[in-house]
């Protein structure tokens, strides 16, 4: 957050699968309301755990170079993510400032879903809460 506030020439790539998947599937700041994890077996409770953290909403009003979120739930979405990452890297090469690209990703193992059902969860739940697209593109033609 502080690097973004200072508009440091840093690229942050964030993979959001709504859980801490490498440590057993515990609730993360991005776990959705009602989503079950090993540390929240009844599901995330808004009153007790608070709302999921949306990094794009937190950073969208900062004076940064680029902010985008994509998804890997289809080949077309993967292509968009690649474009977002390329654009962020190009901005880094030009020294334009802080860039963040968040990638929505499935976690079939810790979600307890099949790979196909994980894609359905992504489309119906994850992408409904975490909107995809480009949110800040400083110095873009036509502005943003």
Identify the role of each PLM range.
Residues 9-13, 19, 57, 65-68, ...:
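Structural motif
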Residues 15-18, 72, 104-106:
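Short, ordered loop/turn segments at secondary-structure junctions
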Residues 16-19, 26, 52:
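Short glycine-enriched loops at secondary-structure junctions
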Residues 1-21, 83-87:
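Thiamine diphosphate
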